[in-house]
Amino acid sequence: MSLYDRLFKPRRYTLPNGAVAEEKRSRAPLVILIVLALGALSVHITGFDFGVLVKKGSKFFDILAAMFPPNTGYLSKIWQPLWDTIKMSFLGSFIGAVLAIPFAVAAASNIVTNRVVVFIVRLFLSLVRTLPTLVCALIATYIFGLGTMAGTCAIAVFTFAYVGKQLFEIIETVDMGPYEAMEALGATRLQAFTTAVFPQVLPTYLSVSLFCLEGNVRYASILGYVGAGGLGLIMNEKIGWREYDSLGMILIVLFVAVMVIEAISHALRKKLT
């Protein structure tokens, strides 16, 4: 019996046949108290003030109003940064998704029997996944300098970690019968994997990669804040100069671009599944 059940005794009911049934106390009150306590502690630590939020929150609507009508004259200067953002997203997603394949295979326990290798690869994927995209972009700018190269590397790292984790989990759920049959016929593990396992996971792998691409288009748009090029660079500039009408034009173009890419990605993923 758990400590909770010892403190809060279960209700006892005597059935018509004389048997005694127990109904355990609900854990909901305890969960609610813990959540409230953590919430109060968070408010105290962060200095959150709801009054300030209400008072200053109206400025958001002031900025929103300043964005419209947008500055259509600025549209011609948006296309190149938008193209840079899309290039970073596609190239970074492609590189990361391709690099994820061998690491996902090495992390799959039903393919690699060496538990040490599986543990090390999974640990590596977990460590890479903990790095925020902006931090990766910032590090990349110190290595490669300012520009889209840094943004592409940051997106590739994020995609690599995300797709790698998803893929090795998918590989571990496949039917291993064809793989074992290929090995019994004398095929190497690589041959057995490429002919018996990879075709099973390919549709899901492509679907996950496309889903990651959708998010990468949005992430790439803010990488310019750390000098990684793209729309984020001019967004940061317009916010700094308080040119909100031009910022509104940038956001509209970005919104349309993201919606188009998501629609195409969604259609492709439906065909794959």
Where are these regions (language model features)?
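Alpha-helical membrane-interface segments at transmembrane helix boundaries
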Residues: 79-87, 121-128, 210, 214, ...
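N-terminal, non-cleaved signal-anchor transmembrane helix
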Residues: 1-94, 101, 106
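Membrane-cytosol interface at the C-terminal ends of specific transmembrane alpha-helices
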Residues: 146-197, 203-212, 263-266
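Hydrophobic positions within alpha-helical transmembrane segments of bacterial inner-membrane proteins
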Residues: 93-101, 105, 109, 134, ...
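Glycine-rich helix-loop "coupling/hinge" segments at transmembrane-helix boundaries
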Residues: 142, 217-254, 273
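C-terminal transmembrane helix and the adjacent membrane-cytosol boundary/short C-terminal tail
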Residues: 210, 248-273
